[in-house]
Regions:
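Conserved G/P- and acidic residue-centered "switch" motifs that form tight phosphate/ATP-binding loops
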Residues: 56, 170, 201
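Long hydrophobic alpha-helical segments typical of transmembrane helices together
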Residues: 187-218
């Protein structure tokens, strides 16, 4: 099997590097860099029409969407998925929850943080900040409190997202948890302990050495 990972710095594609290191599979990396506006290069659309990362070429076929990529390799290798039925359901749920529920308010928070610091005419800035503040108060902050409270409670009850064992659910959840810990306010001791636990894994360390961190340091 030939595997080529298109990796963008500070992106979800670190998940794929980590997965492949956990599975001890051979692969090559084509590195891409974000531009000065933190956007992916337009040329990425030459690899896949969406031009979004991760993009993984497997025997010439391009796979996208990190949850689908993790699921594909875990099923193919028969590893990193629970065998207990209840834990299987939890694993599947968190595989979808990470991007479907947790990431949207985090992305909105990031967008408005950039809006507040973006250069604009002085008479526009109070209006833009006022809009951002209203959306944060009515949507972003309540949504983050809800979801981060749920994540924190989950990790107070078990060491990993699916249960007692590390799985692809943990790899999938790492990006939003890391983003939340770097930006969101409040004490999250169980999230911090989980992050420390999973980032101590040799496979994660190898992936980070090759691809860098998931999110920029503030």
């Amino acid at each position: 099997m030939s595997v080529k990972v298109h990796h963008l710095n500070f992106s979800r594609s670190l998940r794929v590097l980590w997965l492949l290191e956990e599975l001890e599979l051979d692969y090559t990396i084509q590195s891409w860099e974000r531009d000065e506006n933190f956007r992916a290069p337009a040329a990425a659309a030459d690899v896949h029409p969406l031009g979004r990362f991760p993009m993984v070429e497997v025997d010439g076929r391009v796979l996208v969407e990190s949850g689908a990529v993790l699921d594909y390799f875990a099923n193919r290798e028969g590893k990193l998925k629970p065998t207990d039925e209840a834990e299987k359901l939890e694993c599947t749920m968190f595989l979808h929850y990470a991007e479907g529920s947790l990431m949207p308010p985090l992305l909105v928070s990031l967008i408005f943080a950039r809006l507040r610091s973006a250069p604009m005419p002085f008479f526009i800035k109070p209006i833009a900040r006022g809009i951002a503040d209203k959306i944060d108060q009515s949507y972003t902050h309540p949504a983050l409190d809800l979801h981060l409270g749920f994540v924190e409670k989950t990790l107070s009850e078990r060491p990993y997202f699916a249960g007692d064992s590390f799985s692809i659910a943990d790899i999938q959840m790492f990006y939003p948890v890391e983003a939340a810990l770097s930006r969101a306010s409040g004490e999250r001791p169980n999230m911090v302990a989980w992050r420390d636990r999973v980032t101590s894994r040799p496979a994660y360390r190898r992936a980070e050495a090759k691809g860098g961190k998931a999110v920029p340091e503030r």
